[in-house]
């Protein structure tokens, strides 16, 4: 086994004494920092590399702190207007994961960079912490590398806002295997609408 494989196994055993202590200390450290800050290097080099990170120019790591819990509907004094069925304010569940929210915040803050992917680095009772891998698409090291040229194209601008990252695809019902066969047409909503719409075609 290589060094990265050992590192991967360490992160899998989060209940071990070493990891429990490390995660607890790191959570304390991250809480003292701002909600969005640049990390000098990835906390999990093995995970970052599996997602496409390389320790060379053009790659940037940002650490994001996201508050845990459900999403409250942002309405003044709870006035939602409309029918009682839509009066919910507090028990609303957000459709996307906190990880995709972290990616979106990083993408907004660093408008000139492209979000590649992200991974979990810690959590406590109040916050979850993620590290987001971003790429500077105007750097020569990125533009000249055949492996990263795809992300320099304009179609990949703000891919995190459109649910095109790995974390964003999960909430869209997209993936490989038998669990995702029913999401035909690239949208869970479109698939549901097609199944639940009565279509009476004229016989010609």
UniProtKB/Swiss-Prot annotation:
Protein name: Large ribosomal subunit protein eL15
Its job: Component of the large ribosomal subunit. The ribosome is a large ribonucleoprotein complex responsible for the synthesis of proteins in the cell.
Organism the protein comes from: Cyprinus carpio (Common carp)
Domain of life, per lineage: Eukaryota
UniProt keywords, alphabetically: Cytoplasm, Ribonucleoprotein, Ribosomal protein
Subunit structure: Component of the large ribosomal subunit.
PANTHER family: LARGE RIBOSOMAL SUBUNIT PROTEIN EL15, RIBOSOMAL PROTEIN L15
GO biological process: cytoplasmic translation
Protein's cellular compartments: Cytoplasm
């Amino acid at each position: 086994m290589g060094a990265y494989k050992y590192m991967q196994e360490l992160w899998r055993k989060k209940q071990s004494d070493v990891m429990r202590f490390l995660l607890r200390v790191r959570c304390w450290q991250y809480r003292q920092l701002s909600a969005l800050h640049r990390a000098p290097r990835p906390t999990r080099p093995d995970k970052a590399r599996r997602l496409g990170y390389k320790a060379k120019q053009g790659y940037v790591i940002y650490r994001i702190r996201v508050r845990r819990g459900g999403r409250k509907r942002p309405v003044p004094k709870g006035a939602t207007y409309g029918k009682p069925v839509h009066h919910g304010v507090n028990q609303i569940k957000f459709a996307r994961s906190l990880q995709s929210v972290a990616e979106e915040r990083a993408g907004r803050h660093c408008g000139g960079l492209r979000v590649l992917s992200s991974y979990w680095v810690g959590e406590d009772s109040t916050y979850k912490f993620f590290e987001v891998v971003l790429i500077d698409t105007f750097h020569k090291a990125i533009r000249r590398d055949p492996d990263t040229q795809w992300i320099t194209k304009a179609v990949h601008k703000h891919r995190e806002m459109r649910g095109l990252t790995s974390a964003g695809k999960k909430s869209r019902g997209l993936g490989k295997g038998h669990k995702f066969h029913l999401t035909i047409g690239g949208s869970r909503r479109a698939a549901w609408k097609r199944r639940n719409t009565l279509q009476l075609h004229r016989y010609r």
